[in-house]
């Protein structure tokens, strides 16, 4: 067994990445903590839980806790009831290195119809020898336990330096629940955490266990081709040095089928590049694991997949011109860079001349199309004539794409990233190609730039999540109100299990480590408190008519996009939207799969998300429960969001993307059905989960009543509101209908504005108190000229709440606190913990004891 390093908690420590910090509070990790716990039947010992199948009787509780962000909770029910409950030293095979002077500390709470006054407790070493005694437990509230190990009876030769688990033997009722928190050992000033660990312990354990976690994930991938087809399995076998001869034979037989198939595949071309750099004769990692025959065939297939698409003239265009979609674009360009590097160092290929047609972007993306009567010889590509007539080899391409990629990542540090930022799946694809540049570019400066970009991207992620559940507004988040894949990567980087399947295998082996400040930010939501996180979005089109030749498959997003991403982040919930200029010119990506709403700490299945109500029965893509293809106008100030399905917006599509029907459809708000409590009153819906509350109000006028009361104008003004009328209208209460097993409401007016407001138990002891405060807020619909088109005015809860004025009938810019929304927000990223002036390329991250500065500007060409 590997033994855990015992930590000193009173000194200043220096990490491997050169950052220094003084020890802060301990941190719990949402993925690890419940995995440490297991149960057993009477007479048996608990076993190390399976990484793939942790014990489902254990979960986390953000509301009832004593330390950190959450406690671990055990729920006894049916088969889940047990007589032995405990926790292991590590899910990766490490053990506790203690001594007889150590003291076990933990908080424990029991809720049961039968509560014994004391429990048998045992610590077990790797040889099965035990340290036994009893521990006293209080009543139904929390009990803090300090258990000196010297007070327990040790079996002969019990090894204090090789302890693998701690368990309690007890009898519980069928309705029992147990909470554990703050579990750790102390001996003098020595500290070793179990559920709650110091930052240094967590980072050290992440490094020490990485090889084990890689091996476990890749072994699962190697044995199960369903996790990504045979090619991912082949990679895993080569990495683990297992069945190498058999894998080589299969690769040799299968490569030709991929020579010309699906040239825009998100998998195959970057896969071939990685196989070359990991396993070819020239590899600096595992040289020679593919045979010379496989290597030769791989190079031939890679050349055929890339030589036409790798057009040097496209490396001279804007890095904000995106071919096809954002992830496809970076896939193609990253592969152009890396394949050029491969071929410039291969004797058989280094002197070959590339076609460099100069036709434009998106070669082979879809059908050839029409190029013009004078360009009948073209079989593919765009209508541009960019070729300069010169001959370029692989080295020329490599240096052109190297410089392009440097600018690409610097630009995204300056203006914001990505169009598909926070997407449920597409951003994960994009990171595949970010990684390809990071690991295989062959240029030290570019590697440093991408390393900084990783740090920035994960800092952005960490600030808008609670226990791995990502808040923040999302684009291209199709058909699903739930979470995304990025948490799978982050779980691994924080020390959790890896995933060796098709879209994740690369993240295991790139050597990337999180900076200490990002590690802390991700795991210390409680200490960060409540804050606003505001950042600039990207994806507004250049509004060029006609579009430049060669961009028939390309987005033109080289703009200072007028998209403001806004999140109000608390330890209990995150409320988010994107506020965008009414005249912003959208791309076909920036309107796709728009997610906004509220996520909650206590239960990731509790969400409040605006959705489209899809009723298609044609079997097509829109035959889904919820449709995210909606466009919104929004205004948010801290815990209050006012949003409405947009009546109008503007969009430019590349030639290939059809100008389909507008997304306008019946609008709904998704709630789910996992709430602790739900109430409806005076047109509002109130919900509670854990320490959070929310209030939702579709705001609609009482049309029938108003028409009965209204004073009519005469003459040609009879269709307008009269100047003699009252300025406001009566609000309707019956504004929505529950649908789909009462999990979602459908608005009776698809253009009705919706108010979403959050609250916390720190401010309101009960949901009733929150309801009373919300119902007392100032809410009105003001008339304009045309009946039915109003201006909503609302001020939320709290003394610092700002008045939001929102015209629901036109594209007028809303005001917050009397000021118009500034869509040219001066900061690219801004929260109390991360700041960057727009287009500066300088990012400053700070917490109370940690800091990190990212300087992209120093890499710019002078």
Task: Give, region by region, the residue ranges found by the protein language model.
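Short carbohydrate-recognition loop motifs
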Residues: 59-85
């Amino acid at each position: 067994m590997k033994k855990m390093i015992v930590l000193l908690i009173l000194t200043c420590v220096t990490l491997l990445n050169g950052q220094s910090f003084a020890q802060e509070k301990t941190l719990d990790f949402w993925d690890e903590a419940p995995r440490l716990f297991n149960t057993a039947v009477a007479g048996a010992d608990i076993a190390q839980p399976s990484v793939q199948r942790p014990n489902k009787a254990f979960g986390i509780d953000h509301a009832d806790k004593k330390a950190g962000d959450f406690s671990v909770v055990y729920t006894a029910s049916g088969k889940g009831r047990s007589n032995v409950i405990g926790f292991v030293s590590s899910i990766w095979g490490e053990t506790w290195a203690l001594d007889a002077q150590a003291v076990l500390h933990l908080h424990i709470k029991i809720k049961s119809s039968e509560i014994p006054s004391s429990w048998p407790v045992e610590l077990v070493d790797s040889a099965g020898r035990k340290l036994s005694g009893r521990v006293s437990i209080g009543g139904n509230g929390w009990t803090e336990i300090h258990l000196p190990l010297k007070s327990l009876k040790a079996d002969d030769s019990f090894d204090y330096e090789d302890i693998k688990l701690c368990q309690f033997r007890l009898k519980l009722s069928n309705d029992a629940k147990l909470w554990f928190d703050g579990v750790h050992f102390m001996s003098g000033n020595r500290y070793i955490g179990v559920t709650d660990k110091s930052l240094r312990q967590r980072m050290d354990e992440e490094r020490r266990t990485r090889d084990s976690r890689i091996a476990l994930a890749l072994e699962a991938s190697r044995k199960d081709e369903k996790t990504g087809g045979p090619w991912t399995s082949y990679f895993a076998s080569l990495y683990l040095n297992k069945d190498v001869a058999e894998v080589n034979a299969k690769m040799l037989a299968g490569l030709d089928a991929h020579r010309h198939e699906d040239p825009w595949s998100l998998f195959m071309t970057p896969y071939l590049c990685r196989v070359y750099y990991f396993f070819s004769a020239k590899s600096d990692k595992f040289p020679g694991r593919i045979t010379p025959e496989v290597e030769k065939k791989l190079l031939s297939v890679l050349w055929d997949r890339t030589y036409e698409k790798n057009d040097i003239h496209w490396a001279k265009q804007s890095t904000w011109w995106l071919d096809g979609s954002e992830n496809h674009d970076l896939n193609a360009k990253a592969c152009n860079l890396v394949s050029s590097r491969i071929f410039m160092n291969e004797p058989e290929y280094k002197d070959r001349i590339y076609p460099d047609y100069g036709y434009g972007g998106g070669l082979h993306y879809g059908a050839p199309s029409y190029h013009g009567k004078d360009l009948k010889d073209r079989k593919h590509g765009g209508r541009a004539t960019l070729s300069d007539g010169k001959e370029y080899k692989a080295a020329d391409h490599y240096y052109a794409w190297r410089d392009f990629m440097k600018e690409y990542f610097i630009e995204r540090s300056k203006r914001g990233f990505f169009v598909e930022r926070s997407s449920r799946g597409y951003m994960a694809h994009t990171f595949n190609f970010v990684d390809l540049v990071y690991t295989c570019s062959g240029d030290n400066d570019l590697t440093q730039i991408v390393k900084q970009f990783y740090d920035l991207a994960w800092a952005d992620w960490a600030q808008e999540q609670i226990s791995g559940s990502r808040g923040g507004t999302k684009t291209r988040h199709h058909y699903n109100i739930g979470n995304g894949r990025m948490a799978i990567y982050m779980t691994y980087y924080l020390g959790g299990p890896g995933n060796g399947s098709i879209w994740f295998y690369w993240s295991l082996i790139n050597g990337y480590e999180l900076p200490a400040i990002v590690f802390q930010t991700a795991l210390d939501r409680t200490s960060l408190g409540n804050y606003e996180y505001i950042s600039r979005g990207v994806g507004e089109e250049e509004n060029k008519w006609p579009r430049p030749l060669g961009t028939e498959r390309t987005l033109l997003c080289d703009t200072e996009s007028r998209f403001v991403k806004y999140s109000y982040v608390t330890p209990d919930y995150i409320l988010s939207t994107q506020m965008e200029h009414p005249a912003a010119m959208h791309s076909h990506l920036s309107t796709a799969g728009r997610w906004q709403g509220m996520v909650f700490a206590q239960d990731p299945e509790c969400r409040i998300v605006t959705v489209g109500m899809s009723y298609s029965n044609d079997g097509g893509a829109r035959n889904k429960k919820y449709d995210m293809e909606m466009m919104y106008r929004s205004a948010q100030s801290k815990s209050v969001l006012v949003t409405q399905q947009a009546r109008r917006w503007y969009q430019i599509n590349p030639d290939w993307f059809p100008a389909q029907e507008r997304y306008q459809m019946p609008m709904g708000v998704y709630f789910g059905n996992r709430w602790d409590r739900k109430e409806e009153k005076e047109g509002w819906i109130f919900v509670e989960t854990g320490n959070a509350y929310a209030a939702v109000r579709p705001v609609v006028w009482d049309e029938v009543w108003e028409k009965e009361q209204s004073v009519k104008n005469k003459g040609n003004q009879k269709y307008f509101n009269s100047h003699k009328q009252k300025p406001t209208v009566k609000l309707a209460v019956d504004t929505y209908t529950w649908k789909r097993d009462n999990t979602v409401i459908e608005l009776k007016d698809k253009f009705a504005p919706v108010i979403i407001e959050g609250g916390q138990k720190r401010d309101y002891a009960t949901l009733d108190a929150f309801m009373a405060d919300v119902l007392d807020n100032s809410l009105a619909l003001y008339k304009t000229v045309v009946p039915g088109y109003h201006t909503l005015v609302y001020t939320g809860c709290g003394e610092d709440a700002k008045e939001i004025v929102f015209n629901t009938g036109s594209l007028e810019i809303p005001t917050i606190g009397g000021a118009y929304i500034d869509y040219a927000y001066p900061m690219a990223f801004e929260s109390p913990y991360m700041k960057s002036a727009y287009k500066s390329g300088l990012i400053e991250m700070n917490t109370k004891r940690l800091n990190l500065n990212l300087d992209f500007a120093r890499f710019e060409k002078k």
